[in-house]
């Protein structure tokens, strides 16, 4: 059976934005998985995985979340892994890159607004731009939601972005 995994650090993100996509995947024969730090029941999700994500990227607990996510990716063969939210996006792509099943899954990342943008501080650019540029090599498809992010993503030299 085909499998898709949605990753976000909080379940509210999935509940507010991705239920139609989970339903479409289910309707097309996919087993749907969601990895978040919550326990609320998510419609159209066959299997939920509680990962101890923390909102702050500097929180030490995110190291544990990385290991939990990598274990999940090693134990389950996913066809598609779709990462969301800043922490979910970073940890999801890194865990995939360090998993034994990375040759199987295609990894998607939806940038719901980069932290570096025209009016962002220099610190945001110094911190977040290099991280996203580095992680681009672990991204098969990057989806952006605004023109400025699309323009910035072109500098990452990805093979696919929208």
Regions from the language model: what does each represent?
Residues 1-37:
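N-terminal subdomain of nucleotide-sugar transferases
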Residues 3-5, 97-115, 132, 143:
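Active-site proximal beta-strand in glycosyltransferases
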Residues 16-17, 60-67, 106, 116-134:
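Nucleotide-sugar donor phosphate/pyrophosphate-binding loop at the beta->alpha transition
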Residues 23-28, 67-70, 125-142:
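Membrane-proximal helix-turn-helix segments that form the acceptor-binding/catalytic region
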Residues 24-64, 71-75, 160-161:
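Conserved nucleotide-sugar phosphate-binding/catalytic loop shared by glycosyltransferases and other
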Residues 40, 87-88, 148-150:
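Alpha-helix capping/helix-boundary segments
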Residues 83-89, 111:
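Short His-centered aromatic/hydrophobic patch
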Residues 138-162:
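A short, active-site helix/loop in glycosyltransferases that binds the activated sugar's phosphate group
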